[in-house]
């Protein structure tokens, strides 16, 4: 008892280090050893985690964040919005078919993880400093001096997924007088603008000419966005608006202006033709072969390509949807890395920015610079020629065929275009007989046209989502694939690539055309148009929602619209 009392008094009066030493002595040093081991493990864990900064919360950024194993990374996200928007339904938001809140989901809800945390900063990145591995950001809260101070973030890996902005082609008056449809806020402004046009048109004191001008809705661009908005607007006016404003229903007009020869020119010709015929029946004026020269608050001037004639068209509201342009931060970054003058950042097939090994670019702000097989023919031939005989046997070729197909996907597309199954079919002689061996000239000749199948991927949500998911998979297997590379052979330097290159899989595309009709183009040359395609569109878009909450809200909005119609209130 005396010994214990003495130890107690000593413990109370001794410093912390002495207490640990005393306790460690009594317990054989196990506690001190545990403390040291625990501290060592924490340091090791912190050392392991690489800093990943993600710019943007669109399709590419969210797909990456959803699939990334963040136990291995310290993840920070910079985005001017704290939500993800299901952008394919933006045309539906413009007319109240779907409410804006129904297609957005908080990024913080999407990125909830059990074994880690993702930090989100609501800010704009205005400069990427790839030399010092930093991004410089500006908070979006400009009206609050305390919350608007610029800051910078360091990174080990940077994921650039900032998307693109509208391309005005330098046309005078577009920025000042046109609506765009890239964000949820754009859709809400258009919805208010449409209602405003009708409210103004029924005011007393206006001439019929003034009323017609205010009720003339012009869409510039015959791509999916422009066509879907035209269809939604037509349904909104016919099914709902004219019942509320019957006095001006005969004055309403919708015009779709397209510079090309046909609308929906990225779709199958059958769909393009069906869409034009349906719009004509619906009274939508489709004007093709016209180029917009300038826009004012009352008129839009277009040039007829066939005759060169300039035509002035009065308007009440214009939607400009003519493709995508480059954001200033991307233009500045491209100048830094020697890519000035491009529309999008050039990446390799692994989505790494050319010249920046630890910077990746995905989505609308990036474009894959596919490697041409003709530039590597000599290296491929040398790698396959195991006995250095100067000729390739079919057995030697078999050893590299899979690597060729993976590394150069244009070869597989070329084979399909020729209705062939195997590279050996390309190497057949002039009479179609299989060869036993080929020299380098015959090998080069057989693949000389393969690069003609190289195509730039479209700036769509489907492409961006697949790129984000692919990149997350690569990051999740980063350490594993350093030791055991899973990619194709490196024909120039030997060894194997760390990962398989990104390969886009096209699952088809839809074009809602109004009147409960849509057009669908699916793999395998499957084309459908009509009500069945519209119901397929409903099911696919409902299934692709990012959460059960948005899925339920979107389906509920569709049901509400069928029962009660669209709301025409201007809020």
Curated annotation (Swiss-Prot):
Occurrences of domain EF-hand (ranges): 372-407
Q: Which residues cross the membrane?
A: none
Q: Which domain of life is it from?
A: Eukaryota
What are the annotated GO cellular component locations?
A: extrinsic component of mitochondrial inner membrane; mitochondrial intermembrane space; mitochondrion; peroxisome
Q: State its location(s).
A: Mitochondrion inner membrane; Peroxisome
Q: Which SUPFAM superfamilies match?
A: EF-hand, FAD/NAD(P)-binding domain
Cofactors needed by this protein, per the record, are:
FAD
Q: Where is the transit peptide?
A: 1-35
Q: Which UniProt keywords apply?
A: Calcium, FAD, Flavoprotein, Membrane, Metal-binding, Mitochondrion, Mitochondrion inner membrane, NAD, NADP, Oxidoreductase, Peroxisome, Transit peptide
Query: Is NADP set as a keyword in this record?
Result: yes
Concerning Pfam families, the annotation shows:
NDH2_C (PF22366), Pyr_redox_2 (PF07992)
Q: Which residues bind FAD?
A: 51-81
The short motif Microbody targeting signal is annotated over 562-571
Tissue-specific expression: Expressed in seedlings, roots, cotyledons, leaves, stems, buds and flowers.
Catalyses: a quinone + NADH + H(+) = a quinol + NAD(+); a ubiquinone + NADH + H(+) = a ubiquinol + NAD(+)
Kindly report the protein's main subcellular placement as a broad class.
Answer: mitochondrion
- What does the entry comment about cofactor binding? Binds 1 FAD per subunit.
Recorded GO molecular functions are: calcium ion binding; NADH:ubiquinone reductase (non-electrogenic) activity; NADPH dehydrogenase activity; oxidoreductase activity
Task: Write the Enzyme Commission number(s) for this entry.
Answer: 1.6.5.9
**Topology of the protein relative to the lipid bilayer:** Peripheral membrane protein
Known activity regulation?
Activity is calcium-dependent with a more pronounced effect at higher pH.
Which major enzyme category is it?
oxidoreductase
The residues that the entry says bind NAD(+) are 215-251
Q: What does this protein do?
A: Alternative NADH-ubiquinone oxidoreductase which catalyzes the oxidation of mitochondrial NADH does not translocate protons across the inner mitochondrial membrane. Calcium-dependent NAD(P)H dehydrogenase. Binds calcium ions.
Family note = Belongs to the NADH dehydrogenase family.
Output this protein's name: External alternative NAD(P)H-ubiquinone oxidoreductase B1, mitochondrial
Q: Which organism is it from?
A: Arabidopsis thaliana
Gene symbol here is NDB1
């Amino acid at each position: 008892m005396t010994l214990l009392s003495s130890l107690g008094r000593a413990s109370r009066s001794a410093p912390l280090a002495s207490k640990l030493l005393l306790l460690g002595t009594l317990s054989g040093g196990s506690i001190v050893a545990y403390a040291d081991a625990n501290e060592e493990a924490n340091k090791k864990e912190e050392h392991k985690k690489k800093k990943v900064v993600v710019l943007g919360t669109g399709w590419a950024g969210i797909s990456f964040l959803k699939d990334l194993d963040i136990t291995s990374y310290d993840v920070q996200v910079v985005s001017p919005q704290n939500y993800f928007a299901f952008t394919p339904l933006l045309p539906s938001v413009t007319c109240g078919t779907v409410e804006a809140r129904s297609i957005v989901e908080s990024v913080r809800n999407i990125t909830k993880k059990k074994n880690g945390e993702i930090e989100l900063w609501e800010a704009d990145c205005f400069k990427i400093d790839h030399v010092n591995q930093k991004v410089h950001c500006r908070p979006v809260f400009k009206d609050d001096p305390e919350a608007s101070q610029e800051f910078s973030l360091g990174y080990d890996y940077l994921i650039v997924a900032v998307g693109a902005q509208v391309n005005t082609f330098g046309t005078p008056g577009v920025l000042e007088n046109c609506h765009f449809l890239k964000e949820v806020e754009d859709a809400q402004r258009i919805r208010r603008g449409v209602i405003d046009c009708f409210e103004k048109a029924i005011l007393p004191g206006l001439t019929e000419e003034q009323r017609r001008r205010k009720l003339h809705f012009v869409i510039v661009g015959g791509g999916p966005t422009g066509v879907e908005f035209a269809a939604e607007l037509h349904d909104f006016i016919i099914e709902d608006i004219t019942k509320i404003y019957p006095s001006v229903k005969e004055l309403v007009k919708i015009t779709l202006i397209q510079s090309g020869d046909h609308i929906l020119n990225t779709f199958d010709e059958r769909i393009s033709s069906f869409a034009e015929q349906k719009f004509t029946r619906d009274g939508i004026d489709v004007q093709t072969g016209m180029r917009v020269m300038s826009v004012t608050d009352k008129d839009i001037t277009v040039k007829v390509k066939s005759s060169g004639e300039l035509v002035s068209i009065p308007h009440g509201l214009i939607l400009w949807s003519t493709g995508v342009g480059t954001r200033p931060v991307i233009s500045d970054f491209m100048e830094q890395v020697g890519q000035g003058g491009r529309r999008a950042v050039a990446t390799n097939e692994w989505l790494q920015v050319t010249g920046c090994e630890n910077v990746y670019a995905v989505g609308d702000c990036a474009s894959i610079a596919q490697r041409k097989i003709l530039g590597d023919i000599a290296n491929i031939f040398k790698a396959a020629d195991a006995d250095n005989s100067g000729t390739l046997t079919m057995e030697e070729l078999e050893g590299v065929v899979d690597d060729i197909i993976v590394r150069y996907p244009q070869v597989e597309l070329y084979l399909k275009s020729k209705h062939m199954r195997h590279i050996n079919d390309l190497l057949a002689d002039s009479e179609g007989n299989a060869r036993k061996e080929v020299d380098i000239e015959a090998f080069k000749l057989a693949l000389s046209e393969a690069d003609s199948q190289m195509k730039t991927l479209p700036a769509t949500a489907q492409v961006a989502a697949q790129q984000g998911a692919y990149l997350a998979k690569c990051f999740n297997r980063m350490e594993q694939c350093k030791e055991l590379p899973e990619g194709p052979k490196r024909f120039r330097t030997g060894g194997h690539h760390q990962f398989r290159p990104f390969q886009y899989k096209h699952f088809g595309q839809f074009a809602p055309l109004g009147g409960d009709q849509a057009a669908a183009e699916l793999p395998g040359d499957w084309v459908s148009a009509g009500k069945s395609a519209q119901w397929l569109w409903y099911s696919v878009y409902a299934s692709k929602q990012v959460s059960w909450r948005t899925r339920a809200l979107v389906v509920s909005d569709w049901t509400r619209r069928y029962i009660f119609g669209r709301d025409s209130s201007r809020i």
